Every structure is written in structure tokens, then in C-alpha cells.
């Protein structure tokens, strides 16, 4: 059985997609779960006649007995709860202790690190496989690097020691859950200087190999990128994406080398217009970071931001998309570029399909007799299997430019 938890916009989109993709009462046995029976019934009703027989499970995040019973009845738990630092630990603990596979949309690196440290031993003993960051952060980045490096090995005989990701274009609404998680992370960092230093460490998700420390070179402001021939600005999601990519590198035995470099950026175009756009976007990001760091302005900003669970209209989701490139270069100057695209709003439509396919991959793509339990990344656990699923069923493409 596959079981999904928590009511919200991402959950509604994901469940609508699953209902269309696998139905109810077929090969895939699944249910929706959360703490409010009335909201779950409302969600089920919104799915129409075809979802009328979808099972409902009521469980609260602070009820360990109910959570344990819930996860024992499932092969996979997929959760959209957030911010995860506030609501997510009890479900991770239940899955790790009971051998139930788990995936989520978490982009809170400091919380993921805490879960890795606290529950890796339990997961390894039970066989539970736990995979965070199964949405727009960080599947396109993590699987994009995996796809590019595999082609580099085939074409050049070695992996790239340097990769950069460029967001060429994207259209979609801001995710209330993602923004809430960012703000919660800022609040936690402000109150704990030690945590703030940890969050600035690009290797925060590699606690098993604490001696990693080769400096990464994230861009901090507008730059002209010679390889792409455009101006660019920082990409806000690099804060989690790069850390997931580096964890994948570590879990794989560091095949790209001890000095592997990875960065992400948002392309803004050529000429004066591109330069002005790069400066403008960089300034907006700096002002947003400053406003959420200062308590009075943070409270003001939060009044105007979408709340967790709120999302764009179905029409806006369909009109959304993303288009990114990843460029690798080796020491001989040889280069290869790939492209990763999605056909829906990245934060909702595409993310919902990514999470659903990650859940199905956990349920059906692995040998149950070989339970390699622990905390994984999308690339290191699902890799090519998930790429194929996303290309075949989720409107994504992975291609060589």
C-alpha cells in the first residue's frame, strides 16, 4: 500500500494526478491521511466521482501510537507537511523505526541533517529508505547532475569535476509551503549562531563524512556568464539544491573528485536588458532576505505571502513550466550540456507529479529482499528509474543539447 499524508494544495494536486494516473482499487492501493477528517472528506469530494471510494486515515502528528499504526499499514509514506522542522519529525521517526519507505518535499537542510543524525541507525536496522527533496527542490538538480555525469562518463571516459546549472526560464506561483520553510529557517538561524554557521556550510547534508570541505563558489550577485553568454543572478533554490547534489556525490563515494564544484544561477538575458535584470533580481533577493531576518518586517512580509497549502489556480498550473540547463566541463576543456524541462508550474503542478512518481518508484522499482535502509537522495536511490518515470508519466524531459 501507498499512503499519503496531510491536506494542502500540493496534496490535492498530487492526489488528483494519482487518481488519473493509477485510479482507485487497482494495482496501487493508496489512501489519504491527516489530522482533520472533515478536511480529508472535503479533499476526497473535490476529486469527483472517481475518488469516492478513496480510503481516509485520520492521524495526528503528535500521536505516536496512531502514526506507528498508520506507517505499519503502508509500504510508502509520502508527506507534504511543512514546515518540516515544526511538524515532520514524528513521521520520520515512525517510518525509520518501522521499516516503511518515506519521501517528502522538504527543502530545510538543517532539519534533514538532524533527521539523518538521529534516525540513520534505526532506518538501517529496519530497512526504511527515506528520501527528502522530491519536488522542484531538488529533483531537477539532483537527477540532472546524475544524467549529465552518466553521459560524460560514456562520452569522455570520466566525470566532470565542475558543473553549473542555469535556469533559462520558469513560470509559476510562489509556494506558500516553501516560503514558510524559508522563513522558519531564517528564524532558527537568527536565534542560534551555531546553527547559522552550519546552514552556511554547503556540506551540511554530509555529516557521515565531516572532513568534506572543498570551498564551493556560489554566485552572490549579478555576473556575466561566458559559457552561457548571458547575465545571471543568484538562484534562491541553490541553498538546498546544491547541498542535495553534494550529498549524492558523497553517498556515491565521491566519484566526481574531492574538488567537485557545483553552482546554480538564474539567467536574465544578454546586453543591457539582461544586465539590468540581473542587478534587479539580485537586489530583490537581498531585500527579501533582509526583510525576513528582521522580526518586524518579517511579520509584515508574511501578511502578503501565500500561506502553506495555498497555491495557484489550475489554469495557472497548466500555464506554468520550467526550463533549465546543466553544463559540465573537465580539465581538458571538454564540455557537455543537457536540458531538463517540466510542463507545469514548478512549485505545484510539476512538484506534485515528481513526488507522486518518487512514491511509486519506492513502491515498485526495488527488490524487497534487499532493503538498503537509510537516508538517500533521489539520484542515489532512484536515479535512472525515476528519470524514466518522470519522462514517461510526468511531463518532464532530460536531453542532451
Show where each model-derived region lies.
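Conserved glycine-rich Rossmann-like NAD(P)H-binding loop of the short-chain dehydrogenase/reductase
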Residues: 23-39
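Short, conserved SAM-binding/catalytic segment
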Residues: 43-52
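Conserved Rossmann-fold cofactor-binding substructure of NAD(P)-dependent oxidoreductases
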Residues: 57-76, 80-86
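Single conserved hydrophobic/aromatic residue that forms the stacking wall/gate
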Residues: 1-8, 13
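Rossmann-fold NAD(P)-binding glycine/threonine-rich loop
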Residues: 106-128
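Hydrophobic beta-strand scaffold residues
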Residues: 101-102, 130, 398
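C-terminal catalytic/substrate-binding lobe primarily of soluble NAD(P)-dependent oxidoreductases
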Residues: 125, 150-401
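ADP-ribose/adenylate-binding Rossmann-like module
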Residues: 83, 92-112
Amino acid at each position: 500500500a501507498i499512503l499519503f499524508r496531510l491536506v494542502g494544495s500540493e496534496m490535492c494536486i498530487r492526489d488528483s494526478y494519482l487518481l488519473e494516473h493509477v485510479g482507485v482499487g487497482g494495482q496501487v492501493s493508496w489512501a489519504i491521511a491527516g489530522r482533520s477528517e472533515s478536511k480529508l472528506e472535503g479533499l476526497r469530494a473535490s476529486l469527483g466521482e472517481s475518488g469516492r471510494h478513496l480510503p481516509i486515515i485520520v492521524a495526528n502528528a503528535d500521536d505516536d501510537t496512531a502514526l506507528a499504526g498508520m506507517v505499519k499499514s503502508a509500504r510508502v509514506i509520502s508527506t507534504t507537511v511543512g514546515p518540516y522542522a515544526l511538524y515532520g519529525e514524528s513521521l520520520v521517526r515512525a517510518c525509520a523505526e518501522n521499516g516503511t519507505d518515506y519521501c517528502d518535499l522538504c527543502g530545510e537542510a538543517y532539519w534533514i541533517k538532524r533527521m539523518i543524525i538521529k534516525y540513520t541507525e534505526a532506518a538501517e536496522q529496519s530497512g526504511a529508505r527515506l528520501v527528502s527533496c522530491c519536488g522542484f527542490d531538488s529533483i531537477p538538480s539532483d537527477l540532472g547532475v546524475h544524467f549529465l555525469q552518466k553521459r560524460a562518463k560514456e562520452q569522455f571516459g570520466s566525470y566532470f569535476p565542475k558543473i553549473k546549472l542555469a535556469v533559462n526560464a520558469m513560470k509559476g506561483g510562489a509556494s506558500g509551503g516553501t516560503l514558510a520553510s524559508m522563513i522558519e529557517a531564517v528564524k532558527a538561524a537568527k536565534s542560534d549562531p551555531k546553527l547559522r554557521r552550519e546552514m552556511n556550510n554547503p556540506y551540511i547534508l554530509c555529516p557521515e563524512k565531516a572532513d568534506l570541505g572543498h570551498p564551493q563558489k556560489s554566485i552572490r550577485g549579478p555576473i556575466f556568464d561566458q559559457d552561457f553568454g548571458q547575465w545571471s543572478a543568484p538562484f534562491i533554490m541553490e541553498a538546498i539544491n546544491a547541498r542535495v547534489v553534494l550529498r549524492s556525490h558523497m553517498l556515491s563515494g565521491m566519484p566526481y573528485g574531492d574538488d567537485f564544484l557545483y553552482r546554480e544561477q538564474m539567467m536574465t538575458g544578454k546586453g543591457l536588458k539582461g544586465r539590468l535584470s540581473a542587478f534587479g533580481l539580485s537586489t530583490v533577493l537581498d531585500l527579501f532576505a533582509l526583510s525576513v531576518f528582521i522580526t518586524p518586517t518579517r511579520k509584515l512580509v508574511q501578511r502578503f505571502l501565500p500561506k502553506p497549502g495555498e497555491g495557484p489556480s489550475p489554469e495557472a498550473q497548466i500555464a506554468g513550466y520550467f526550463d533549465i540547463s546543466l553544463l559540465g566541463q573537465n580539465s581538458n576543456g571538454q564540455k557537455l550540456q543537457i536540458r531538463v524541462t517540466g510542463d507545469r508550474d514548478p512549485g505545484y503542478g510539476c512538484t506534485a507529479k515528481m513526488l507522486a512518481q518518487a512514491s511509486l518508484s519506492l513502491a515498485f522499482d526495488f527488490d524487497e529482499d534487499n532493503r538498503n535502509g537509510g537516508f538517500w537522495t533521489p539520484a542515489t536511490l532512484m536515479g535512472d528509474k525515476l528519470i524514466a518515470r518522470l519522462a514517461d508519466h510526468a511531463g518532464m524531459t532530460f536531453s542532451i543539447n
